[in-house]
Amino acid sequence: MAKEALELKNEANKFLKEGHIVQAIDLYTKAIELDSTNAILYSNRSLAHLKSEDYGLAINDASKAIECDPEYAKAYFRRATAHIAIFQPKEAVGDFRKALALAPSDPAARKKLRECEQLVKRIRFQEAIHNTEPPSPLANINIEDMDIPSDYDGVILEKQITKEFVEDMKERFCQGKKLPLKFAYSILRDLKELLEKTPSLIDIPVKGDETLVICGDTHGQYFDLLNIFKLHGPPSPTNKYLFNGDFVDRGSWSTEVAFTLYAYKLLYPDAVFINRGNHETDDMNKVYGFEGECRSKYNERTFNIFSETFSLLPLGSLISDSYLVVHGGLFSDDNVTLDQLRNIDRFSKKQPGQSGLMMEMLWTDPQPAPGRGPSKRGVGLQFGPDVSKRFCEANGLKAVIRSHEVRDQGYEVEHDGYCITVFSAPNYCDSTGNLGAVIKVKEDMELDFHQFEAVPHPNIRPMAYANGLLSGM
């Protein structure tokens, strides 16, 4: 490796270790420009892309490293990890096998290959049993006959949820306590019944003295969610909330966040709204921690019922005919209309898959360049400012509001104002140092941005319940 390229690599490694990912990628890129045949440089940049969640770019760089040196085990390991991150375990198995063949004494490669093979077997088994529509996980449960544990000292959940119960539940969660299964199942059942009557695109009017608080990703950061309520008031009939997906996974209080949002939705069904994000899906939950958290804190049935409710969540919201709010972004087709979004049959499809309107609503990202481009994530696509403008003008919208990506300041107005990103998980995964933000909207439809910092939380690391295949990213 040329001396200057080596110096750039060493400096980039330092930035990466300190969590300054953008600077690290920039320096790796400069080093590659000086030495474009060095596998280590591509592999290191692949790791940086893994940390920034640009999994498609991570796969590309790992593949380039393999082209430069087909015997470089770490590159296969990086590529396998990126495939796992976008739930492509079958592709990952081959790379883990190659990494282990090249480094047979590496215990990490051996362990991850075994876990990946087990995951593939599990997927195949589930595919085999799901050829026919499985019964609801709520079937054959008589919730009313379930017992409440004798040591439960909280407010009792009656037939109708109450503000007293919700406030007590929130406080108990702060103390590390769980819901009795009777109450957990009751909340999930009632929420399921409510969502079954909800369209795929919901209309949210904001009138008179009402305020709507739009929140982006919260990702299991329960104590930051409570801080949002402290700063902007809890949900109420006049203080509405819209949560724009990705409220589970990564953070280690995802069940607490989910039950809190669901309880508020039941308490104020016309004032609390929840869009589906790409992490309210089975594939992501198996890898990023929510399934593991449900199993640890409750049981497998609890996860299966959550999964059923996730498949019923609306895919988008329309605020006073002015702003479309979706988790990911816009579409591969310029001619998509709001009526098409309303008519999506989310009840039969359930999971977003790899193509189609549902997938694009959950996965796509904006790009600075005009037109459309491949996704840096490896799923979906990227859309430019001209795409945003055409969509808004064709559908009579002021802008599209989306989430799905960290922003250093918690939000970003993009595409000449036609695309706005809001992200509400400050210091995401305890590592990025970003601010969180929410958007407040009143009847005049002016957007009011509010930023906030992370608050302390108990000493449980992010991804504590995640699949071990992602460790070391």
Curated annotation (Swiss-Prot):
Record's function text = Protein phosphatase that specifically binds to and dephosphorylates the molecular chaperone Hsp90. Dephosphorylation positively regulates the Hsp90 chaperone machinery.
Keyword Nucleus carried by entry:
yes
Please give the superkingdom of this protein's source.
Answer: Eukaryota
Which regions does the record annotate with the repeat TPR?
5-38, 40-72, 73-106
User: By its UniProt entry, which Pfam families does this protein fall under?
Assistant: Metallophos (PF00149), PPP5 (PF08321), TPR_8 (PF13181)
Give the UniProt family note.
Answer: Belongs to the PPP phosphatase family. PP-5 (PP-T) subfamily.
GO terms, biological process: signal transduction
Subcellular localization, as worded in the UniProt entry:
Nucleus
Q: Which region ranges are annotated with the description Catalytic?
A: 159-472
Q: What keywords is this UniProt entry annotated with?
A: Hydrolase, Manganese, Metal-binding, Nucleus, Repeat, TPR repeat
Concerning PANTHER family, the annotation shows: SERINE/THREONINE-PROTEIN PHOSPHATASE 5-RELATED (PTHR45668), SERINE_THREONINE-PROTEIN PHOSPHATASE 5 (PTHR45668:SF5)
- The protein in question is named Serine/threonine-protein phosphatase T
- Where is the catalytic site? H279 (proton donor/acceptor)
Establish whether keyword Protein biosynthesis is in the entry: no
Domain notes per entry: The TPR repeats mediate protein-protein interactions with substrate proteins, but also autoinhibit PPT1 phosphatase activity. The TPR repeats mediate protein-protein interactions with substrate proteins, but also autoinhibit PPT phosphatase activity.
Instruction: Write out the catalysed reaction.
Output: O-phospho-L-seryl-[protein] + H2O = L-seryl-[protein] + phosphate; O-phospho-L-threonyl-[protein] + H2O = L-threonyl-[protein] + phosphate
Q: Which cofactor does it need?
A: Mg(2+); Mn(2+)
Origin organism of this chain?
Answer: Schizosaccharomyces pombe (strain 972 / ATCC 24843) (Fission yeast)
* SMART domains reported in the protein's UniProt record: PP2Ac, TPR
Cofactor: binding comment: Binds 2 Mg(2+) or Mn(2+) cations per subunit.
Q: For this protein, what is the EC number?
A: 3.1.3.16
Positions annotated to bind Mn(2+) 2: D246, N278, H327, H404
Gene Ontology MF terms: metal ion binding; protein serine/threonine phosphatase activity
| Cellular component GO terms held in the UniProt record | cytosol; nucleus
Can you tell me which residues bind Mn(2+) 1?
Answer: D217, H219, D246
